[in-house]
Amino acid sequence: MASKKEIKDQIISVTNTKKITKAMEMVAVSKMRKTEERMRLGRPYSEIIKKVIHHVLQGSLEYKHSYLEKRNDKRIGIIIVSTDRGLCGSLNTNLFKQVLFKIQNFAKINIPCDLILFGLKSLSVFKLYGSSIISSVTNLGETPDLSKLIGSIKIILEKYQNNQIDRLFIAYNKFHNKLSQYPKISQLLPLYNEKNIFSNKKIKWDYLYEPESKLILDTLFDRYIESQIYQSLLENIASEQAARMVAMKTATDNSGNRIKELQLIYNKVRQANITQELTEIVAGASAVSVD
């Protein structure tokens, strides 16, 4: 059994750890409120521009944009949004598992994937797997600057327009509530989905565009892609802070339980030492009295 000093040192060590995790929990709570508010403020714009795109694509567009072309899959692009830091539970792990599963499924039918990585954790993981990484952005912080992302976004969009990739996905963590975040992989391009909601053309119609449809639709579709990527970043950042808050609370609670266990062991050792000392005193006294 460990000595009293060793147990006491463990108690001090765990107590210090508890103070750190408690402080990190409080910081995460504060940051989560801000990031959650920022994320919720961004959702209406993201949803409305999605509805605008949906409505535009219901028409019979004279201008056939490359984002609407359905192609045979020869190469896939995936944007992966992760965190820059750890200590957020299994948030990144769950996302990476889904992405790797998707990459492996494409690999089985000889379709390679190009990756755009946002976040240091995704960069460190997918480098190990020898993935085809065409661009990466790290150190985004709690308030990502869209101007830092534009370069990487343009690279992947140019690849799509030049037929170098045939489909584009984005993988991120969707914020549900403070206790629930889940990995999500959505298709960005081409602008259709498996339910084909973007091509339901019962009545042929189109908008009247000024100055011309190409200029407006090019801008609109690019803004749509940018908004979806930026909103995914906000969702992931809010998820990160919520996951870190939960992880640090769990660590704090576990530290508290461990301190109680160690305190109990310490008391037992102390009691055993006292009992042993009393036994030795009584034995010594008995020996003296016999003499």
Swiss-Prot record:
**Membrane topology annotation:** Peripheral membrane protein
One term of GO molecular function? proton-transporting ATP synthase activity, rotational mechanism
Q: Which GO terms describe its cellular component?
A: plasma membrane; proton-transporting ATP synthase complex
Q: Does the keyword Membrane apply?
A: yes
Localisation: Cell membrane
Decide whether keyword Ion transport is in the record: yes
User: According to the UniProt record, which cysteines are disulfide-bonded?
Assistant: none
The superkingdom of the source organism is Bacteria
Under the heading Gene3D superfamilies, the entry gives: 3.40.1380.10, ATP synthase, gamma subunit, helix hairpin domain (1.10.287.80)
GO biological process, any = proton motive force-driven plasma membrane ATP synthesis
Which keywords belong to this entry?
Answer: ATP synthesis, Cell membrane, CF(1), Hydrogen ion transport, Ion transport, Membrane, Transport
Alphabetical list of PANTHER family matching this protein:
ATP SYNTHASE GAMMA CHAIN, ATP SYNTHASE SUBUNIT GAMMA, MITOCHONDRIAL
Q: Tell me the function of this protein.
A: Produces ATP from ADP in the presence of a proton gradient across the membrane. The gamma chain is believed to be important in regulating ATPase activity and the flow of protons through the CF(0) complex.
Under HAMAP family, the record lists: ATP_synth_gamma_bact
Protein name per its UniProtKB record:
ATP synthase gamma chain
